[in-house]
Amino acid sequence: MSLFPSLPLLLLCVVATSYSETVNCEDSQKICPAVIACNSPGINGFPGKDGRDGTKGEKGEPGQGLRGLQGPPGKLGPPGNPGPSGSPGPKGQKGDPGKSPDCDSSLAASERKALQTEMAHIKKWLTFSLGRQVGNKFFLTNGEMMTFDKVKALCAKFQASVATPSNAAENRAIQNLIKEEAFLGITDENTEGQFVDLIGNRLTYTNWNNGEPNNADSDEDCVLLLKNGKWNDVPCSSSHLALCEFPI
């Protein structure tokens, strides 16, 4: 005959014995008649399943981590603004006097005389080929035809002025020089009928043609030297021979 009547009856006895706090050995025999005697407690069972996560705890204090290595140097920044000018430096010492080359006064005088002689020859050549000299005036023409304003500009470029005869000799010299009618440095642009030179001085010598000046076209403010040596008033915008005078 088997010691345990049946397996289900045995399990029932084990459960009743595990969860009863006041059941003694005698009671257990009454409940489980198949159990002969009370034994010692059995071994612990396997751990149960993990429970649910608890509530979030408070934030902890920062940790004391290790300091990292120093990184490489950064790029150079843009240049700054220029600083203020410094104070002037101390004055330097006075230098030694310079040495002037020894000049031979006699040699300088001879060279100066030779230069003056050469300039006189050049002046004669110019007078013979291009111009006329009367007293301290030298008259020259480039043979070009242009307006009065352009003649003034041309003469001023060479530090000269438009030819203005102040006597019969100068008027005759200009007449012999020109082959075309030429402007003179005389005008009444400022005051009609009152002809003056380019400085503004009134004329002390005139040689008007018959019936001139007549201002025929109401704008004849400039003066022309005709081939016969007489003067005629003409518009300044007309083109005639350029003639300059150089002081000598």
UniProtKB/Swiss-Prot annotation:
Question: What Gene Ontology biological process does one annotation of this record name?
Answer: complement activation, classical pathway
Domain Collagen-like, residue spans: 42-99
| Localization per record | Secreted
The leader peptide range reads 1-20
Keywords of the record: Calcium, Coiled coil, Collagen, Complement activation lectin pathway, Complement pathway, Disulfide bond, Hydroxylation, Immunity, Innate immunity, Lectin, Mannose-binding, Repeat, Secreted, Signal
4-hydroxyproline occurs at which residues?
Answer: 47, 73, 79, 82, 88
Which parts of the sequence are annotated with region: Disordered? 43-111
**Which chain positions lie within coiled-coil regions?**
112-130
What is any Pfam family matched here? Answer: Lectin_C
Alphabetical list of InterPro entries matching this protein: C-type_lectin-like (IPR001304), C-type_lectin-like/link_sf (IPR016186), C-type_lectin_CS (IPR018378), Ca-dependent_lectin (IPR051077), Collagen (IPR008160), Collectin_CTLD (IPR033990), CTDL_fold (IPR016187)
Residue pairs linked by disulfide bridges in the UniProt entry: 155-244, 222-236
Q: What is an example of a GO molecular function annotated in this UniProt entry?
A: D-mannose binding
Composition bias, kind Pro residues: at what positions?
75-87
Task: List, for all copies, the residue spans of the domain called C-type lectin.
Answer: 134-245
CDD domains, per the entry? CLECT_collectin_like
Assembly and binders: Oligomeric complex of 3 or more homotrimers. Interacts with MASP1 and MASP2. Interacts with MEP1A and MEP1B and may inhibit their catalytic activity.
**UniProt-listed PANTHER family:** MANNOSE-BINDING PROTEIN C, PULMONARY SURFACTANT-ASSOCIATED PROTEIN A
Q: What is recorded about the domains? A: The coiled-coil domain mediates trimerization.
Name of the molecule in the record = Mannose-binding protein C
